[in-house]
Amino acid sequence: QSAARATETRTLVQQLLPGFAGAAVLDADGLNAAAQLLAEDKPFPHPAGELVVTPHPGEMARLTGLSAAALATDREGIALRYAKAWNAVVVLKGARTVVASPDGRVCVNPTGNPGLARGGSGDVLAGMLAALLACGLPAYEAAACAVYLHGAAADRAAAKRGEYGMLPHDILPELGALFAENQR
């Protein structure tokens, strides 16, 4: 990301997000902008509605100042600590993604595979999460559902193409069947 684009993203996160009335997902460059604000002792940007942050371990290290080794020792506890500190649902991505809520709920996702480490997979997850929030699901439930279905769809894609052969767009065709199977 260029310096100019980083500045634009930071400005959007700092100025637009606090005035936003709905629920929001903060991912990728938005997380980097939030990390810059936190480094300057500014408050974590937050919309009026619920907020979900979706860091991978590197982004979480930048946001918290913790080392990757420290993060690996207690992923659930750290996700919960920052969910409370930021008043946001934290989706700490990685092997067995952790979803933590400010009210103390935590779940560890059983689905997914190393193929999800490929660039673009997190964008699919962020889109799924935003869609579920737009449908009216509360943030924690939307995050837990999106993470589970994202991982399950990736498991199906990996069964067809291999963990290292699958691409983010291979996840999408598997979602329709999963939604149909899990519909109430």
For every predicted segment, state its role:
Residues 63-64, 110-116, 126, 130, ...:
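Short beta-alpha connecting loops at secondary-structure transitions
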Residues 77-80, 107, 126-127, 140, ...:
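Feature representing long, continuous alpha-helical segments
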